[in-house]
Amino acid sequence: MKAKFHIPDIWVHKDLNLYLIDMIKEHPEFFYDDIEIASCYGCFPSALWNGGRALGGLALETQITSTIKAFNDRNVPIRYTFTNPTLTEKDLKDKFCNHLCAIAENGFNELIVNKPFLEDYVRRNYPKFPLISSTVKQIEDYDQLMEEFKKDYKLVVLDYNWNNDFEKLDKIPQELRSRVEILINPYCTPHCKRRKQHYEVLGESQRKCSKQTIYEQLGAVRSVKDPMEDANNFNCPNTRYNFYQITHYSTFVSNNDVYGRYLDMGFNNFKIEGRVLSKPNVIESYVYYLVKPEYRDRVRLEMLTHRPQV
């Protein structure tokens, strides 16, 4: 069974991810057998619908279209993270987010959703998008999870607290396991009580970013208040952790378990976290999960020193 990985981010780590995809094609001997980069998820700044992580700044039209094309030309779909928990139905009219949908809707690219009204809106107006049920929903109840599979989601991203709970995972019917996506390196503390609040703070910060003028987004005019201030000041030490500081968590999925127990059970979609993490952290996660041990030093160095062509 092929292991399918979903990697971060189409904007922050665009060049790194394109380099990774090309390296897998050019040097398959560096990597574990039967792996695939099945999508690259994220969003463009400063999209109001974006959730999970806050993203400020400005993306030009040419940057957006060239990014989508670069991934699609490599047979990798982009996957918008439209999971802002603060959205209301009024936000469905957002011009920029609708434009992002219009230029990416080709039956190949995907959307991650968590709000029913946004999901319904997308189904009506952009029906070609395969939809992914977000981990932001924080579903830990088995019956509630089974309800998700009754919908036509391409994949359902499990709450990370399901990780390594093999008694619960074994209850998921075999025929549904290929539609399960597992977040294998969660930085959140297991069963974090503030996770919902953190998502909401990030969502409010994203809303503030989307309201900035173009001059503020370009940095030509200083904002009265940094729209990212609340997100940056949220008291969560995990946001400063490196990859190896989370490997002791009960919810961390080891590479041995990915290629052993999980694939053996029929789970083959794996999400790697890291949208706004530093480049070295993201590289380390790729090296750990994708690269054969004897090539890890070489691949790590090549990724760290790679300079994209202008």
Model regions: which residues?
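Solvent-exposed alpha-helices and their adjacent loops that cap or buttress functional pockets
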Residues: E148-K150
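Active-site pocket-lining/capping segments in soluble small-molecule metabolic enzymes
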Residues: M1-Q144, Y153-V310
